[in-house]
A protein has these predicted regions:
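Intrinsically disordered, low-complexity activation-like regions
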Residues: 3-134
Length: 134
């Protein structure tokens, strides 16, 4: 999970290569979370990494899964879950608004909509999104 989801994001910031293994990471997260017994046994720190690909997905249903996983984390480590929750909601809100992450458009060779351009030029863009913009 760390190799597919985190390493590429940090090594290849601002390029399409940052997202090259998102599909593999997401598939692994989906497979792992289907096993509810396993999910209930794992510590909060592991659930955090299993949940990351859901946050990085441009599918709103995956963000709902991240919120559900955060609920499981809450029962194990309230502090960790409450720290992560605003970040999960922030990511989800962007997907709900645009249907994708506008800050990836340049790297993914996608055209911005007018609304996306206005957002990208605003102070609303979170730091984690700015870090992927070149």
């Amino acid at each position: 999970m760390i190799l597919f989801d985190q390493l590429t994001r940090n090594c290849f910031r601002g390029t399409d290569r940052a997202f090259a293994y998102d599909g593999a990471a997401l598939e692994l997260s989906r497979r792992l979370t289907k096993d509810t017994e396993l999910v209930n046994e794992l510590p909060a720190s592991v659930l955090h990494f299993i949940g990351s690909p859901f946050l990085h997905s441009e599918n709103l249903e995956d963000h709902d899964m991240a919120l559900a996983l955060n609920g499981v984390t809450l029962a194990k480590n309230e502090t960790a879950a409450m720290y992560a929750r605003p970040h999960i909601i922030n990511h989800r809100d962007i997907i709900a608004r645009f249907g994708r992450y506008p800050h990836r458009n340049k790297a993914m060779e996608r055209d911005n909509t007018e609304e996306e351009t206005a957002w990208l030029e605003s102070d609303e863009v979170p730091g984690w999104a700015k870090s992927q913009m070149k």
